[in-house]
Structure formats: C-alpha cells, structure tokens
Amino acid sequence: HRLLYITNNINIPEVIRSKYALLVETEIPEGYGAYFSFNEKNLNVNNFYHLKSAFNYLLEGDIVRVDDRGNFATLFRVNSTNNTILLTTRCNHYCLMCSQPPTTEDDSWIFSETMNLLEMIPDTTKVMGYSGGEPTLYGDDFVRLIKKTKDYLPNTVIDVLTNGRAFSDYSFSKKIEKANHPNCTFGIPLYSYDPVNHDYIVQARGAFDETIKGIVNLKKCNQRVEIRIVIHKQTINDLIETCSYIARNLLFVDHVALMGLEITGFTRANL
C-alpha cells in the first residue's frame, strides 16, 4: 500500500511528485505517484485509477491509499469534520447490534499505516477519531499511537471509541495519562445498569465490571470520558435505570450521550 495526497496541480516539482495522486483529465505529466481520472480513456499511463462519480468529493490535500492491484480508498478528507480512522476490526466484544462486526484476522497493517498517516495529516485538523473493533487491543502500541498523535496533532480534538475494558488495568490508564494528549476523549458504551444485561448485549462475561473499573481509572488519571448508551430493544427497557445509575455512581464523567443505531452489520436483527 502507498499513501498519497490528492492534488490538481500539474506543476508540482518532479522531485516530490511521487507523494501525490494527480486528478487529471487531459494532460498527463510524468512522475506522480498515481493518476486519478473520471475519464476512462486515460488508460495509457502507469498507476492509473478510474474514479466513479461517487468520488467526486475528492479535493486538494485529501489522503488516499492505493495499491498495485488497482484498489484505492480515501483515508482522510481535509474539509470533513468526521474523519475517523478504523484501527482494527478485531474486538473482545461481540455486540448484538454491532455495526462493524468483528473479525479474527490479523489486520495490524492498519496500525502501521495509521502511524504513517499521522505524519501526513495537517496539524490544523480540528477533530479526528479512532475506532474499531477495539483499538486498545494493540496494548502499548495504542499508547504509542496516542503519543504520536500528540506530537503531530497537538491541537486536534481526538475521540477514541473503546469498550473501556483495557483501562481496568490501572497501569495502562497511567500510560495514557503520561502520553499527555491535551484533548482526548474516550467514548465508552454502557448498555445497562444491570451487569447481566450489559454482558449479554456485548456477549462477554465480566465486561460490565471491567468497563466500570476502566471508566473510574481513566478519570483517576485525568482523562475525558463520554458514556454512550445505544438505544435498541435490548437497552430501552433499562434506559431510565441506567441513566439513574450513571447519575448516582458516575457523576464525574464529562458527557453522556444517547446514541441511535447505524442500520448495518448485526443491527437489523436487534432494532
């Protein structure tokens, strides 16, 4: 895989052209890392990628991944406030309504790619997110990621979507504190005040206790925490009691959000 900036500029100095994917329709200057076009006729050049109309949002400075088999994907959009990086599809939950069903495959290449991507993202980016799967399955590498995010994007608001269980290990929470990102929020789902129901929804025994302990440890380590309650048929009956539980026992969290469902993945069976 290669990561490239999108550009419309045909006059970029040749010495750095290999870092760019040129959006081109007619003239094809040499030396660019890839050539993107909505015109299928431009096939007489190496590293050519024909774009469907759905990609007409691509702008100068967007970042894409390309490979030698003709595949490409958009990783970062300069004008978007919803840039979220999927770090892994692996997870230690199997939530009944998961919109991103977990896999067991080794996708650690995504982590390596993300570490490189951080060096390309503009430091003027206002907000960005990390999600999964479960990002903290990377362990100490996840801490490295937060440190590097601070180094390259110190003014960017970072939202991390996690089940929070890894933070039940206080030493891991302390490592996150030492990474010292100035504006990082951990969004952690709590599906029920009832441990049995929460564990059933996430299909993991003992998850409730680890999640609560993780929330407490993060706050002990001066981290921002948002509790998320996804509303569906397995959580709606407990909603008032769950909110009361949070108000009584977790009043120190920074934010509580009631979330709607994404109608993908396992969701259709558990509306």
Model-derived regions, located:
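A short acidic, helix-capping loop that chelates divalent metal ions and anchors anionic groups
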Residues: 194-201, 264-270
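Conserved phosphate-donor/acceptor-positioning beta-strand/loop module used by diverse small-molecule
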Residues: 91, 186-190
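Short Fe-S-cluster ligation motifs
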Residues: 117-137
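Canonical radical SAM enzyme core domain
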Residues: 102-116, 135-179, 190-195, 204-210, ...
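A structural signal for short coil/turn segments at secondary-structure junctions
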Residues: 121-125, 153, 179-180, 222, ...
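Conserved C-terminal portion of the radical SAM core fold
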Residues: 128, 183-186, 209-270
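Flexible, acidic/Gly-rich N-terminal and inter-domain linker regions that tether
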Residues: 1-81
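Canonical Radical SAM [4Fe-4S] cluster-binding loop centered on the CxxxCxxC motif
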Residues: 76-111
